[in-house]
Amino acid sequence: MTSFDFLHINTEIVGDKVVGNAGGVLGKMLQSYVDQFFEKINALKVIAKVNGMHVYNLYNPPFPSQAGMRFLERKLRMMLYKVAFPVTANLAITHKCQCQCIHCSADPFIDPAKKELTVDEIKTVVDGALDLGASLIIYVGGEPLLREELCDLIQYVDKTKAIPMIFTNGLLLTEENVRKLAKAGLFSLNISIDSSEPELHNEFRAVPGCYQKAFEGAERCRKAGILTGISTYATSESIKTGKVEKVLKIAQEQG
């Protein structure tokens, strides 16, 4: 039993703001920290509302939610015990990918001679991450949609503890796959867009039509209720020349 078994936090939305009231034995002592936490949260822009919950970014759980309370508990543990606890677990579930990106961050770590983790092994890692306090489980690759057990792995994530996310190139976001992802409980995903110019994006990834398919897939995901963001490759040059800003503008235009 930990000290937090004696702390009960009730959260609600009042006037479009999230408020938390700490009870239990530790409630009075920690209320000021809870107030500070939600003061920072409420200063952020609400980018989406899902089932009465506020979403501020794709890397933290929505509030109020059970996963969000775990996120807050992690903050309190770090403050009291002076020990860092992970908030995110990035799990590379496959090295397979249809693209051959010139800037691939995974490529240096890929060894075809090594076997991929089994589903049971991945689930064990997920369990361990949740036990450590992670509130976000991200499946990456390679291309995670090339792993046929992806939906099973998404469904396995205990939604009362964490939210599941994937990073994808968008090529396999068909109507059927998006429906399966939504049914499995995928909360959000990031689609890779490397340039505001379709030709350059396709060239970077060595896949003709990749740009169009990515945005078509993004639209399907939004319609299915999956929060959808864009992941882009940035360099100091692309930032200075405004190329990254153009990608962000397209993301806003696409919704």
What is the predicted function of each stretch?
Residues N21-G23, G52-Y59, Q66-M69, M79-L80, ...:
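Generic detector of short, locally flexible boundary/turn motifs and exposed helical patches
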Residues V119-Y139, R147-G255:
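Radical SAM/AdoMet-radical enzyme domain recognition
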Residues P61-P62, K96, S196, E237:
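Generic structural motif
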Residues M1-V87, C99:
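Flexible, acidic/Gly-rich N-terminal and inter-domain linker regions that tether
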Residues K28-Q36, I102-D107, P164, L171-L173:
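Short N-terminal helix-initiation segments at or just after the protein's N-terminus
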Residues K82-D120:
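Canonical Radical SAM [4Fe-4S] cluster-binding loop centered on the CxxxCxxC motif
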